[in-house]
């Protein structure tokens, strides 16, 4: 069983995918930089969790 992500992470990730779909790929490192560019995220941990969620969503969409 996987970990359940917080609603804030899911909501933020979904909004970023809707607005900036062309910036995100299936590569976590690139998504980390993209999240930092387009969103005002206060902590590194939160940025990484959102980038991880976006990466997983992009991989599911492309599969």
Swiss-Prot record:
InterPro entries documented for this protein:
Ribosomal_eS17 (IPR001210), Ribosomal_eS17_CS (IPR018273), Ribosomal_eS17_sf (IPR036401)
* Positions of transmembrane segments: none
Q: Which Pfam families match?
A: Ribosomal_S17e (PF00833)
> Which residues does UniProt assign to the signal peptide?
none
Please cite one Gene Ontology biological process associated with this protein.
Answer: translation
In terms of superkingdom, the source organism counts as: Archaea
Q: Which UniProt keywords apply?
A: Ribonucleoprotein, Ribosomal protein
- Please name the GO terms that the record assigns under molecular function: structural constituent of ribosome
GO CC annotation: cytosol; ribonucleoprotein complex; ribosome
Question: HAMAP family this protein is in?
Answer: Ribosomal_eS17 (MF_00511)
Give the family from UniProt: Belongs to the eukaryotic ribosomal protein eS17 family.
Database matches in NCBIfam families: PRK01151.1
Its recorded name reads Small ribosomal subunit protein eS17
**Organism for this UniProt entry:** Methanococcus maripaludis (strain C6 / ATCC BAA-1332)
């Amino acid at each position: 069983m996987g970990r359940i992500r917080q609603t804030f992470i899911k909501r933020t990730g979904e909004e970023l995918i809707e607005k900036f779909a062309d910036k995100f790929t299936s590569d976590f490192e690139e998504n980390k930089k993209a999240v930092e560019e387009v969103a005002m995220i206060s902590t590194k941990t939160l940025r990484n969790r959102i980038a991880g969620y976006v990466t997983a969503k992009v991989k599911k969409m492309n599969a």
